[in-house]
A protein has these predicted regions:
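Short amphipathic alpha-helical segments
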Residues: 27-52
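Active-site-flanking beta-strand signature of metal-NTP-handling nucleotidyl enzymes
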Residues: 16-22
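N-terminal amphipathic/basic-hydrophobic helices that include classical n-h-c signal peptides
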Residues: 1-13
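A general secondary-structure signal for short beta-strands and their flanking turns/coil
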Residues: 14-16, 61
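An amphipathic, aromatic/His-enriched active-site/gating alpha helix that lines ligand/cofactor pockets
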Residues: 49, 70-108
Length: 119
């Protein structure tokens, strides 16, 4: 009782992925507005490539927390990389973020290590 089980994924499990980005302080309201009307073709592409339960959370200081569930994170990223709508979306989003070091926002998403999960 009270012991934690190690984290593992079964063959059919969805992987929970969380990442952090930083939105520029002067772009916070514009970032919020653009996400009120994400392009339908972008939403369709995300769904087609296994992005499920995808959420973004934005703190007032610009910290953006992204969360998504997918069976295969690498395949989900690769699938979106081949979508023309994603190239357009990433180009449109690029100037909203700090510290991208010359890459698109989707290339700067580095998954955090999950250390606990209560199902």
């Amino acid at each position: 009782a009270g012991r934690l089980r190690p984290l593992s994924l079964s063959e059919n499990a969805m992987r929970r992925v969380c990442f952090l980005l930083k939105v520029r302080s002067e772009r916070l309201e514009a970032y919020r507005r653009v996400h009120e009307e994400v392009w339908p073709e972008m939403l369709e592409a995300l769904s087609r490539h296994g992005w499920k339960n995808y959420s973004l959370f934005l703190r007032d200081d610009g910290l953006l927390v992204g969360y998504v569930e997918t069976p295969d994170w690498d395949a989900a990223l690769a699938g979106m990389a081949g979508e023309p709508v994603n190239a357009r979306w990433q180009a449109a989003m690029k100037d909203y973020f700090e510290s991208l070091e010359g890459v698109n926002p989707d290339e700067a998403m580095r998954p955090l290590d999950q250390v606990f999960h209560l199902a």
